[in-house]
Regions:
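Short hydrophobic/aromatic-enriched beta-strand-loop microsegments
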Residues: 55-57, 74-76, 119-125, 171-179
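A transmembrane-helix-recognition feature enriched in membrane-embedded lipid enzymes
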Residues: 63-68, 191-232
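Short gly/pro/ser/thr-enriched loop/turn and capping motifs at secondary-structure boundaries
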Residues: 62-64, 159, 181-186
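Short, well-ordered alpha-helical microsegments
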Residues: 40-42, 106-107, 159-164
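Proline-aspartate-enriched helix->loop->beta-strand connector
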Residues: 143, 147-157
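Short, flexible loop segments at boundaries between secondary-structure elements
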Residues: 127-131, 173-209
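N-terminal nucleotide/polyanion-binding subdomain common to many enzyme families
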Residues: 1-75, 81
């Protein structure tokens, strides 16, 4: 399977979740969720990180762009679901390290994972508040020493991608950026109901619940224009 370039951002057009999970089982690298915002506004540094690793289709915009390029069977794989499917498949085979959220959020996330997946090997975790270069170095040293198989980083883009690449230089593993997935998993943030997700309308649901997101959603108008004009 070949990567597809969308405005210089390379995306793997997976046709099933199983294909991506099989990739996780046989490769190492950073999994980056690709949506319209990343396609339009990725910095050169972020674009290089994505293209050296694995971009997968997380948003409806990215999925439509792939279909427009002829990959009719490409599917959207939401990152907030993918990390749990990775755990469900590999929780007895691989070790995990979690980074992100407030201290109470990461502790609740770890506790819930241990209840939901008895026997899961959580090699370590810490909150996402890194306040100094020394703390950053200590975290990287810790992960390199523990050598987990999978590292989840929930800090939002581009912070999480930059941190994952730094850790990757010291320790090869599967990395996945999760944004606010720990908040969703612990029930602090409500995800859009299934109907909205299935009909590629999750962005509209979020906008209704959080009107302050309107500035972030404006890029969707530009993205739709680009799709219409075949500029991707």
């Amino acid at each position: 399977m070949q990567k597809v370039s969308l405005n210089g951002v390379e995306v793997m057009p997976f046709t099933s979740e199983l294909e991506l999970l099989d990739y996780v089982d046989s490769h190492k690298g950073i999994l980056v969720a690709i949506n319209a915002e990343k396609i339009l506004h990725a910095t050169e540094q972020t674009r290089q990180i994505i293209n050296r690793n694995l971009g997968y289709c997380d948003g409806s915009g990215a999925m439509m762009a792939l279909k427009q390029k002829g990959f009719k069977n490409a599917i959207k794989i939401p990152g907030c679901e993918l990390w749990l499917k990775i755990i469900a498949r590999f929780n007895t085979e691989k070790s995990f390290y979690l980074i992100g959220g407030k201290q109470e959020v990461i502790e609740e996330t770890v506790g819930k994972l241990r209840r939901d997946y008895p026997g899961i090997n959580i090699a370590g975790y810490r909150n996402g508040y890194i306040n100094s270069d020394e703390e950053r170095r200590d975290l990287i040293d810790t992960v390199a020493r523990i050598k987990p198989d999978v590292v989840f980083v929930a800090m939002g883009s581009p912070k999480q991608e930059l941190l994952m690449e730094e850790i990757q230089r010291r320790h090869q593993a599967i990395f996945q950026g999760l944004g606010g997935s720990f908040d969703v998993y612990t029930g602090r943030v409500e995800r859009a109901p299934k109907w909205w997700v299935d009909h590629n309308m999750e962005f509209a649901y979020r906008l209704m619940r959080q009107p302050s997101r309107i500035k972030r959603q404006i890029h969707l108008v530009k993205f739709a224009f680009w799709l219409t004009c075949h500029k991707l």
